[in-house]
Amino acid sequence: MDRKNVGLRLMDGAGYKKIIIACDSYKGCLSSREVNEAIASGVKEWNADDASPEIITLEMSDGGEGMLDAFLSAMKGERVRIHAHDALMRWIEAEYGIVNDTAIIEIAQTAGLALIEPEQRNPMKATSWGLGEMIMNAYRRGVRRFIVGLGGSATSDCGIGMLKAMGDDWKKIRRECSFVLASDVTNPLCGENGAAYVFAPQKGADAKMVQMLDDRARKFAEVSAKHFGYDRSEAPGAGAAGGLGYAFLQYFNAEARPGAELLLDEIGFDALILDADLVITGEGHSDRQTLMGKLPQRILEHVTNQKIWLVSGGVSDRKAMLDAGFDRVVQVTPEEMPLDEAMKPEVAHNNIIKAIREQFAL
């Protein structure tokens, strides 16, 4: 749909009756919830003397950072805390969620890169064992449907650790459970575009390790293919999370979906915005990659009869954003402000409020 004329029949500035705020996190600075709350504060300050609009804030995630919080906030689920192992087999406390009969799992809760000190990161040793423990905990509680966010892993073990932690129960889980993977990664398991070559260097692997990890993944895929009679190692997303994508696709017949789109569907986003007249989304930095399936672009695809603003920490390619259909493109960070200053949470919070007030004054 051509959105360029949609905004002409909606008023600018104040006068909005219902506003939906659904921003991704400003990574390394503010969570999705904190960004949303800052925008809401700016809206409320401007409308203080008028009839305040209804404001609905929706925590967002693309399947990585913040996915668990986003689902539980939107769908009012239960938070479950367990003891499990991290990627170096150290005992930690980790959380997952249960919404109705579905478990919401972030692999980063157990196999997360952020849990491992930089000097200890080693994907040759890192294991997804703790993820297997978490899935088993939910399974024993009666959960049979799983949504798994694949972002932020420290591992490159193709899910072998997860499968070992399940023991023979992986066969029952395969028969009885369904898995949906939240990930925007489309890489295969092996080769120059695979898990080892593309992602392992970010997890501490040197060139020799990368080759060894790729060889290990290839051998595991060959053995698995002989066992099942089919091979998912080339499937889009098999290379996600150090090959965990492959393990779920090959062993549990998982369905892989873009994380942002999955969240929007699960929370009923289309119904929520039906009677809204303004949607505000954003992220830490918006550029042409934003239009390649990142959260703001996914939200843009759902917006038809509403205005939509893109409110991000930084913005490149502003014209491309406007041409794509955003009615306003707002950079909250002043041009002259150094990045290290702008990344301070309190500074970013205040920048957002000021930028929103200025937009409503237009």
PLM feature spans:
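N-terminal loops that bind phosphate or other acidic moieties
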Residues: 7-362
